[in-house]
A protein has these predicted regions:
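Transmembrane and membrane-interface helices of multi-pass
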Residues: 2-152
């Protein structure tokens, strides 16, 4: 059986994948939020520093995972999945209770799961399926296209 060769991207290609992937993670996160994506982008256009401040945690995570794994596609896939799931949880919580997801809610996970039975939740299965499909596609790209290894 013939083994398929994986292609290795140039350092510029790897940097481009990381940059576009970070923007994709940000847009995915914003698209999962409650409200209009266009109105959110308009508010970022009025205050560009807000976009940068919202983007840097995703960029930091993507770069950290890239330096740990050495693959830009896996990094972008993981970053999109983590931030997308946080945005998805925020969407469901805002619709159910009217208040946003905060880090302290993680400590209340078991209590929240017990209380979830009291709510009629719209789980937005289509959005969740699209998020997971996108992350799987990005991970598959990591199998087919290898990134150049990070050098310090």
């Amino acid at each position: 059986m013939k083994k398929r060769k994986s292609h290795i991207m140039s350092p510029a290609g790897t940097a481009l994948v990381l940059l576009l992937g970070i923007l994709l993670a940000a847009m995915t996160t914003l698209a999962l939020e409650q409200g209009s994506l266009l109105s959110t982008l308009e508010s970022f256009r009025a205050e560009p520093v807000l976009f940068v401040l919202n983007l840097w945690p995703m960029a930091a995570m993507a770069l950290l995972v890239y330096f740990l794994l050495g693959n830009a596609w896996y990094s972008v896939s993981f970053t999109t999945l983590v931030w997308g799931l946080l945005s998805y949880v925020n969407l469901v919580k805002v619709e159910a209770r009217g208040d946003p997801f905060v880090p302290g809610d993680i400590l209340l996970l078991t209590e929240g799961m017990e209380a979830a039975g009291n709510y009629q939740l719209d789980m937005h299965w289509g959005k969740l399926a699209l998020l997971l499909g996108l992350c799987l596609l990005l991970a598959f790209m990591g199998i087919r296209l290898k990134s150049s290894r990070p050098r310090l």
